[in-house]
Amino acid sequence: VVEVCVRVTGGEVGDASSLAPKIGPLGLSPKKIGEDIAKETLKDWKGLRITVKLTVQNRQAKISVIPSAAALVIKALKEPARDRKKEKNIKHTGSVTMSDIIEIARVMRPRSCAKDLANGCKEILGTAVSVGCKVDGKDPRDVISAIDDGAIEIPDA
């Protein structure tokens, strides 16, 4: 069993040349895998940069999507998918709810370095700052300090 991780843009057939050195030696067709990845990521992750893990066993590839925190935050904004080729460096101006942030922190929990869910939420809020969106209409930095002050309670489950 071999695992290969690849960064792709959801719903797009990446050029086979970037996949070839990684999966060519395993006896798989890079072009076919590229199309499979595009099909797998089209409906949920269109236009978002995500990591895809290929688990290769007996020349069969299983595709699993590993979304980054940023991809999850952008997905929670529920913005319409934009054409990546036309618009570069998109600023996300929408607002995410605090319950969305807690939900994302739960999803990211196994890969997070945080001790508890509250700190996991602060990690995601930091990502929200980088994405450029607001949380319940407020700046994510203010929400982080509100969590530190105890003004916002985060359930430990």
UniProtKB/Swiss-Prot annotation:
Example of a GO MF term: structural constituent of ribosome
Gene3D superfamilies documented for this protein: Ribosomal protein L11, C-terminal domain, Ribosomal protein L11/L12, N-terminal domain
Keyword terms, alphabetized: Ribonucleoprotein, Ribosomal protein
Superkingdom per UniProt: Eukaryota
Gene: RPL12
GO annotation, cellular component aspect: ribonucleoprotein complex; ribosome
Record-given protein name: Large ribosomal subunit protein uL11
First and last residue of the signal peptide: none
Family stated for the protein in its record: Belongs to the universal ribosomal protein uL11 family.
